[in-house]
């Protein structure tokens, strides 16, 4: 499995279907994602790998805050063609 940490993904299932999220950490079959608004960094969402579609964009999660995360996702979704 490739490293997904820091990668922007699009949700393909669930209430957040169609939204962009950032993978904070991953294990063998799940990813833990946040978007800074609905899912803050303090309470990550656990999603199955089959319910997310990875993009080619990777961000640095080292000094990430909820505000920075919201801004990055908004810029990405405005510039993407999904």
Predicted regions mapped to residue ranges:
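Ferredoxin-like alpha/beta domains used as RNA- or RNAP-binding modules
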Residues: 1-5, 12, 22-82
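Short, charged beta-turn/beta-strand-edge "cap" motif at the junction between a beta-strand
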Residues: 14-17
